[in-house]
Curated annotation (Swiss-Prot):
SUPFAM superfamilies: PLC-like phosphodiesterases. Dermonecrotic toxins cleave the phosphodiester linkage between the phosphate and headgroup of certain phospholipids (sphingolipid and lysolipid substrates), forming an alcohol (often choline) and a cyclic phosphate. This toxin acts on sphingomyelin (SM). It may also act on ceramide phosphoethanolamine (CPE), lysophosphatidylcholine (LPC) and lysophosphatidylethanolamine (LPE), but not on lysophosphatidylserine (LPS), and lysophosphatidylglycerol (LPG). It acts by transphosphatidylation, releasing exclusively cyclic phosphate products as second products. This is Dermonecrotic toxin SdSicTox-betaIIB1aii. Belongs to the arthropod phospholipase D family. Class II subfamily. Expressed by the venom gland. It comes from Sicarius cf. damarensis (strain GJB-2008) (Six-eyed sand spider). It comes from the Eukaryota. Its cofactor is Mg(2+).
Length: 274
């Protein structure tokens, strides 16, 4: 999975897909009451990027629904995963549950259209810290209460704050989540990051019977040398400001026979058995 990073303006979707991404990440900004308003990162952000691009969240969902719906004029077959980077650190932790309700309802109304949409992308909920876990509980409660629990099959969980992996496992256990879990490891492209935690996550992913990590990705990679390093370690995905660079690295002799781009037929919730 090549995840285009910070794809917050509607016009950026095609831009990143044209560069080779098969997944996109966008930022969800909330008001003080936990209501999702816009796709927007804000300052500071990655080096060399404009931090201020944005769109109305519901309008963004309406567009991305079309882009991921077969037979729609806007359909792009390669886009199979949507990562929602939830900016919950900007609101009170007491509002995390309200935020989870709101995002679930907006996805129901504008992406899935309560069963009337054929939009097919998988959804990854990127949660900043484990203390925000009430967002997940609310999201799942809302799908159940609204009568659309089946959409849980399309939704995965990912904690992005580089916290202790055992601490994350404990929270997933509290929530009763034993599947459909990704684990991110990384830092803004402005800084270097070691591989200790990334290696630990990959080791847990590959441990038989360990159900709290199905996929691991590294972020935000812009240098080809770091992309190569991550691929050698065996990551499932790379988040990048430059998907075209990832494509070029994947075509190199060292990686061409070991990796390929994920398609819709690849289940993002299953561990890869090479």
């Amino acid at each position: 999975w090549i995840m285009g990073h910070m794809v917050n303006a509607i016009e950026q979707v095609d831009e990143f897909l044209n560069l080779g991404a098969n997944a996109i990440e966008f930022d969800i900004d909330f008001d003080k009451d936990g209501i999702a308003q816009i796709t927007h990162h804000g300052i500071p952000c990655d080096c060399g990027r404009k931090c201020t691009k944005k769109a109305i969240f519901t309008e963004y969902l309406d567009n991305i629904r079309q882009v991921t719906t077969p037979d729609d004029p806007k359909f792009r077959e390669q886009l199979v995963l949507l990562a929602l980077d939830l900016k919950l650190r900007r609101i009170s932790s007491a509002k995390a549950y309200r935020a989870g309700e709101d995002v679930a309802k907006k996805l129901l109304d504008h992406y899935w259209q309560r069963g009337n949409s054929k939009a097919r992308a998988y959804i990854l909920l990127n949660i900043p810290l484990v203390e925000d876990y009430e967002f997940i509980r609310a999201f799942k409660d809302t799908l159940k209460n609204e009568g659309y629990e089946s959409y849980n099959d399309k939704v995965g969980i990912n904690f992005t704050g580089n916290e202790d992996l055992d601490k994350i496992r404990d929270v997933l256990e509290i929530l009763g989540i034993h599947k459909q879990v990704w684990q991110a490891d990384g830092i803004t492209s402005c800084f270097a990051r070691g591989t200790e935690r990334l290696k630990e996550a990959l080791k847990k992913r590959d441990t038989p019977g360990y159900n709290y990590i199905n996929k691991v990705y590294a972020w935000t990679l812009v240098r080809k040398s770091i992309m190569r390093r991550s691929l050698r370690l065996g990551v499932d995905g790379v988040m990048s400001n430059n998907p075209d660079r990832v494509i070029k690295v994947l075509k190199e002799k060292e990686f061409a026979d070991k990796f390929r781009l994920a398609t819709y037929n690849d289940n993002p919730w299953e561990k890869f058995r090479g």
